[in-house]
Each structure stands twice: as C-alpha cells, then as structure tokens.
Amino acid sequence: MKIVEVKHPLVKHKLGLMREGDISTKRFRELATEVASLLTYEATSDFETEKVTIEGWNGPVQVDQIKGKKVTVVPILRAGLGMMDGVLEHIPSARISVVGIYRDEETLEPVPYFNKLATNIEERIAMVVDPMLAIGGSMIATIDLLKEKGCNQIKVLVLVAAPEGIAALEKAHPDVELYTAAIDEKLNDKGYIVPGLGDAGDKIFGTK
C-alpha cells in the first residue's frame, strides 16, 4: 500500500494548532479544511495532464489540463464532512458520495447506517476523507462498499493515522493509497489515537 505522510511545514504547523486541547469549534473546523486542502494537493500529484488548445487573449494557446479524471469525494459521516470542502476547493466539479458508519463504543466495530453514492462510481477516482484512521474499521467498511459498487481507484485522506489502523487498512486493501498529515504513536485502550486530536467529530460539530 502506498503510504504518504505529508511533511510539508504548513501541514505540520496547522496540525500542531489542531492538537490544542481547548481549541474552538470554529478554529478546528477551519484548520481541518485547510489541512484537507493541502493533502488533496499531494494526493492529486499523479494525475495525468494533456495538452488542450483554448482561445487565449491573443489567439489560440496550448494549456495543460487534467486528463479524463472523474472524481468523487467520499466523506465518512459525520466527521468526514469537516474535510470535504478542502478537497472541493481544488476539485469543485467532483461528485459527492456520502457513507454513514459509526463505531460502536463498546465493541469498537463499525456499524453502517447510510450511503448515497455518485452515479457511475465505477468510472471515478474515490477520495475518501475522515479525520482519524484509528482502528480502521470504518474506513475498511467504506472501501468494501466502494469496491462492491465497482470503484477500484481509491485514495484515502486522513488528518492523523495510528500504526494499528494503517496495518489493518493495508491488510484489507493493499491497493489503496493513504495520505495523512501525521502518523501518531498508538491507540489507547479506548481506541483513540495518542497523541491524536481527541474526538474530531465533536470538535468539528461543537458537540460532546
């Protein structure tokens, strides 16, 4: 599995700000969008381009444009919505596919409850966004669903990943690509990433 930990100074700086324990909902939400935007820049670096002739200000001119890539952004509800706009800043024409999965707090197993996928998803590159890759169950279940529907070009964008989640994802789906702002130390006994960000969904939505 291709694993990219994006170590750009802006990414490290913004993620560091997100780790503050008393960060406001507004600030956390803004930073989640900004980091997602920077991850998108990295995740699309392998998109092919082609020469296209357009009418410029002084006549025809050849320009580079992305070659035939249809993209769908796949936020995992609910926390993934906090990263969606960061992707759409760069790919505003992307279709949105929504997958609802929550983690059972006792068993830590993923529980699917909703999905609405873009049309012709088998022809699209899926960019799955979720702030945390902890145990990996929700991400694996989402990718299972996408592959069942014929989507086999999948990139995963997360703010923070735990080694345990990376290992689980690689075992289940070695063909996907993972882009993360940080690979943290470990999971604690409650399945939270340490040092992590805390509950990203609560911080994005202002709930507890």
UniProtKB/Swiss-Prot annotation:
It comes from Vibrio cholerae serotype O1 (strain ATCC 39315 / El Tor Inaba N16961). 5-phospho-alpha-D-ribose 1-diphosphate binds at R78, R103, D130, P131, M132, L133, A134, I135, G136, G137, S138, D199. This is Uracil phosphoribosyltransferase. Its EC number is 2.4.2.9. One of its GO terms (cellular component) is cytosol. NCBIfam families: PRK00129.1, upp. Pfam families: UPRTase. Belongs to the UPRTase family.
